[in-house]
Amino acid sequence: MGDKINFIFGIHNHQPLGNFGWVFEEAYEKCYWPFLETLEEYPNMKVAIHTSGPLIEWLQDNRPEYIDLLRSLVKRGQVEIVVAGFYEPVLASIPKEDRIEQIRLMKEWAKSIGFDARGVWLTERVWQPELVKTLKESGIDYVIVDDYHFMSAGLSKEELYWPYYTEDGGEVIAVFPIDEKLRYLIPFRPVDKVLEYLHSLIDGDESKVAVFHDDGEKFGIWPGTYEWVYEKGWLREFFDRISSDEKINLMLYTEYLEKYKPRGLVYLPIASYFEMSEWSLPAKQARLFVEFVNELKVKGIFEKYRVFVRGGIWKNFFYKYPESNYMHKRMLMVSKLVRNNPEARKYLLRAQCNDAYWHGLFGGVYLPHLRRAIWNNLIKANSYVSLGKVIRDIDYDGFEEVLIENDNFYAVFKPSYGGSLVEFSSKNRLVNYVDVLARRWEHYHGYVESQFDGVASIHELEKKIPDEIRKEVAYDKYRRFMLQDHVVPLGTTLEDFMFSRQQEIGEFPRVPYSYELLDGGIRLKREHLGIEVEKTVKLVNDGFEVEYIVNNKTGNPVLFAVELNVAVQSIMESPGVLRGKEIVVDDKYAVGKFALKFEDEMEVWKYPVKTLSQSESGWDLIQQGVSYIVPIRLEDKIRFKLKFEEASG
């Protein structure tokens, strides 16, 4: 036996909650189904498969033949089911009670197709030591992470061809390291190269094991892989040669643990894969991180010292993207509220799907349809519990928010940030109208002369960013909310707002307002630099009404502007100036139909809020919402009303 190498081959198949149906369909046709069909033809090939809950639900509803074939392969011993949180949460980011329930749901599904699952695929391989207790309590014996985790703990690469034990609070679990070299070989290099590498590991130790476990989408969905993997026959050759090679002993995780013991005890730090430590850093620091890595590579010492190069951790995304943080903290709030409500918890668990909370190579938090799916389920879960009025630091930034509820809406105000309306969620439509992501500089945009100088002057990557995209790029001074108050000089234009060039007098969008609660509403006030703003907001059955009283004591005329950022995402808007007593917008596939209403005829400026982000297909200029601005000349004192109405039809 010492003249062989044990080899565990695993895949992880996942589609985000809320992804488009055509994406599921294409992934199924190009990847999931042909992979499983090919596997069926090679009865000696063994594969550990993890399938995420959103994908399982789609398969059950649309392609039950996949589940049937998977069940058959499990029965004949070819497939081991590896579980995770059912709706693919980052386990470290959700409460312990929710982790246990998420894992229980997936273990029950695995049992329904004939497998008693004992192992966990760790979503995005985000590890923190206290997960050990949760996993053991969930009946899990082993977990799979990257070899980078082990090297970060001080182990050498040569020590990473065995699983180890790790412990926390007296609970012990086995941990398998994924071989990074195999991740880059499979399926991108010829099969000969894979076999050559596996053969090179043989040294007479019969317990030695090489582990490959990576995204199943690499086998057909990633650019160029369908032709390579299926049409040119890579997968068939791989299955054929791996399963017939006398020097390779194919195993499943459970088979390995039945035959061999883990090698010893290790303590892994909080970690994910190496690239995540770059992506999770704030943009300026991520830029420095990339420069540092490149400098080490130029000097030829990166590989030698790589394990000591560490950036951020996954939870840094909640610092990097405040919109993600708010969504996450609302999820934690709802989790506590519905802990004993099984019906509500179904929706809560869906709202924990990880993809919409972060951003790396793929769109993630930048994709409005993924965030909409989170809010849809959060609002459903929240609606099982009546809140009334809540004063609480919802987002954990040290300042109180005020949540007001009526039969149809949740409204959350942030007095510390310009008295803005930071959430306006409809119980009927299951949308948050204020789900608008701010425009931010990302480290892969290249260098920008000034982060807030309006139109971006991008140098390093300007040849890669098409001109028609680059001319629309701007970065925001403030977060994107409703009822944001601006005091700016006369002569300020729509274009100034659109490209963040407006010169704010007094920083009203982010200064703190005082507040008092009213019956069904709130009054917010601020006096600053001789400008006094009072806004009284009341929730009504079909939206909210606000009355503004603004007093200019300076003697100098200015422009007072109220901004409402609305998550209009399915109709592509253009900048423009509107006038009237009513502005009606019908966003059929996102937030639906709504109206802005005024007592008198008003001018309204509008422009689309477009972010620039990277994805697997290149550059994405995505409309996150539309900014509606009501500009009014302020000489001494003005009083006006506006209404946001959820319109029918």
Curated annotation (Swiss-Prot):
Q: Which reaction does it catalyse?
A: Endohydrolysis of (1->4)-alpha-D-glucosidic linkages in polysaccharides containing three or more (1->4)-alpha-linked D-glucose units
Active site at 124 (nucleophile), 215 (proton donor)
Q: What class of enzyme is it?
A: hydrolase
Q: Say which domain of life the source belongs to.
A: Archaea
Per the UniProt entry, the Enzyme Commission number(s) are 3.2.1.1
**Key words of the record:** Carbohydrate metabolism, Glycosidase, Hydrolase
- How does activity change as temperature rises? Optimum temperature is 100 degrees Celsius. Inactive below 40 degrees Celsius. Extremely thermostable.
A GO BP entry is: carbohydrate metabolic process
| One family name in Pfam for this protein | AmyA-A_glucT_m
Entry's pH dependence statement: Optimum pH is 6.5-7.5.
Query: What are the GO MF terms of this UniProt record?
Result: alpha-amylase activity; carbohydrate binding
- What family is this? Belongs to the glycosyl hydrolase 57 family.
Query: What subunit structure does UniProt give?
Result: Homodimer.
**Job description of the protein:** Displays a broad range of substrate specificity, with the capacity to hydrolyze carbohydrates as simple as maltotriose.
Instruction: Report the protein name in the record.
Output: Alpha-amylase
